């Protein structure tokens, strides 16, 4: 029997990228932005006067290397690999300086994944998997398999896709019906 495949986004799905951006922007611009303030918006729309600072933070060498892992992501992804072919599909083209950092981060925090399954791309319509778990509605719109939205503060008002709110939800979605 052929195993089904799952492509998983990195930023805001495996890694808490936005939390790190908010911390850096708050520190540098002496702001007090909280995650909850985004309420369905992207950070650049909440503080448009600091859009250049957001870009600067993202382009800093090492930024993507030190992100926190989302709760339960490691354990659930490891379990998924027992039943599915798992790929990491990260849209790295917007921040080309992120390639090495993202690669090293994945090797450190997900050492059980085959690096040949890391896909650095722009648009995820090139990814031919059965499922895509992503926080970005634009990527989910163009994906040809089954799109699954991972909840993030910027997408909470989007109801066009099946949704998972956490890695425990991902585990339930994919593993609860697997024959033991």
From Swiss-Prot:
Task: Please explain the role this protein plays, according to its UniProt record.
Answer: Dephosphorylates the 5' and 2'(3')-phosphates of deoxyribonucleotides.
Q: Which cofactor does it need?
A: Mg(2+)
Q: What does UniProt list as catalytic?
A: 9 (nucleophile), 11 (proton donor)
InterPro entries for the chain:
5'(3')-deoxyribonucleotidase, HAD-like_sf, HAD_sf
Q: Could you say which residues bind Mg(2+) here?
A: 9, 11, 135
Protein name in UniProt: Putative 5'(3')-deoxyribonucleotidase
Alphabetized GO MF terms? 5'-nucleotidase activity; metal ion binding
According to its UniProt record, which protein family does this protein belong to?
Belongs to the 5'(3')-deoxyribonucleotidase family.
GO biological process per UniProt: pyrimidine deoxyribonucleotide catabolic process
Q: What class of enzyme is it?
A: hydrolase
Cite the entry's keywords alphabetically: Hydrolase, Magnesium, Metal-binding
Give the EC number(s) under which this enzyme is classified.
3.1.3.-
Q: Does the keyword Methyltransferase apply?
A: no
Does the record's keyword annotation contain Metal-binding? yes
């Amino acid at each position: 029997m052929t195993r089904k495949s799952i492509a998983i986004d990195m930023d805001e799905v495996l890694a808490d990228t936005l939390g790190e951006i908010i911390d850096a922007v708050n520190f540098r611009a002496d702001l007090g932005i909280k995650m909850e303030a985004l309420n369905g918006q992207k950070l650049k729309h909440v503080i448009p006067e600091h859009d250049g600072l957001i870009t600067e933070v993202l382009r800093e060498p090492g930024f993507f290397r030190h992100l926190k892992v989302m709760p339960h992501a490691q354990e659930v992804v490891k379990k998924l690999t027992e039943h599915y072919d798992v790929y990491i599909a990260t849209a790295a083209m917007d921040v080309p300086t992120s390639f090495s950092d993202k690669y090293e981060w994945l090797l450190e925090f997900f050492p059980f994944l085959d690096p040949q399954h890391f896909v650095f791309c722009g648009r995820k319509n090139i990814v031919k998997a059965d499922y895509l778990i992503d926080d970005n509605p634009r990527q989910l719109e163009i994906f040809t398999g089954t799109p699954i939205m991972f909840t993030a503060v910027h997408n909470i008002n989007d109801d066009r896709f099946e949704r998972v709110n956490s890695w425990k939800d991902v585990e339930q979605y994919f593993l609860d019906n697997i024959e033991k």
